[in-house]
């Protein structure tokens, strides 16, 4: 192969490379949504532990106010440009033949053990999750069974401004609590009480 033949084909070989470089560029690209959005519960089974007292790592303000949030989520889009209203209802039939992992039957959280802020959750514009506040009453904390995973609040989405994701339209929300003295304690010979290896459950909002 002579020198002139090689020089003749160098521009032809370089052309695809130049086209590749000019076709690739950085920048923001917008991708279309799926065409519709849906609402759902992220978890169908959930244990919410109300942790009373203080924690240096976790904000327990809601816990000490005996409150927690029941949340729904939206999917199918890259953003939420409006408030999405989700109506729900407590559905005791969701607990039919339901048991915890150890075989203990789930017990419906008595209606006098809690107060719902309403029967509608709102996912605010700009957010993909929103909920309603649940306030636990003194009756809940007076029940010794509440310190164990016993009671469940079964909730089902009944209507929404968007479609409802099938199979994730409900959640079984188990509620329990730990008081500030929960844990393993030892007493020294002089009568002093020392806390050792406390049982700690991370608070989840």
Residue ranges of predicted features:
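Short secondary-structure subsegments characteristic of cysteine-rich extracellular domains
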Residues: 18, 154-157, 205
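Terminal connector regions
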Residues: 139-175
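Acidic/polar, low-complexity intrinsically disordered N-terminal segments immediately downstream
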Residues: 25-116, 127-131, 141, 145, ...
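C-terminal motif of bacterial Sec signal peptides marking the signal peptidase cleavage site
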Residues: 19-23
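Bacterial N-terminal signal peptides that target proteins for export
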Residues: 1-11
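Ser/Thr/Gly/Pro-rich, low-complexity flexible regions
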Residues: 168-205
């Amino acid at each position: 192969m002579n020198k002139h033949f090689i020089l003749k084909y160098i521009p032809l070989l370089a052309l695809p490379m130049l086209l590749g470089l000019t076709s690739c560029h950085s920048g923001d690209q917008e991708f279309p949504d799926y065409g519709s959005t849906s609402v759902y519960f992220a978890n169908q089974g959930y244990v919410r532990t109300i942790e009373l007292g203080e924690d240096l790592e976790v904000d327990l303000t809601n816990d000490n106010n005996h409150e927690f949030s029941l949340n729904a989520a939206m999917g199918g889009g890259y953003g939420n440009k409006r408030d999405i209203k989700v109506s729900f209802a407590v559905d005791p039939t969701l607990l039919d033949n339901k048991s915890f992992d150890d075989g203990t039957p789930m017990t419906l959280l008595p209606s006098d053990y809690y107060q719902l802020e309403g029967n509608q959750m709102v996912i605010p514009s700009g957010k993909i999750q929103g909920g309603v506040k649940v306030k636990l009453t003194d009756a809940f904390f007076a029940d010794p069974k509440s310190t164990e995973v016993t009671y469940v609040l079964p909730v089902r989405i009944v209507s929404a401004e968007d479609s409802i994701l099938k199979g994730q339209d409900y959640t079984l929300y188990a509620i329990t609590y730990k008081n500030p003295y929960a844990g393993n304690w030892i007493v020294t010979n002089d009568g002093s009480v020392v806390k050792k290896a406390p049982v700690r459950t991370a608070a989840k909002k």
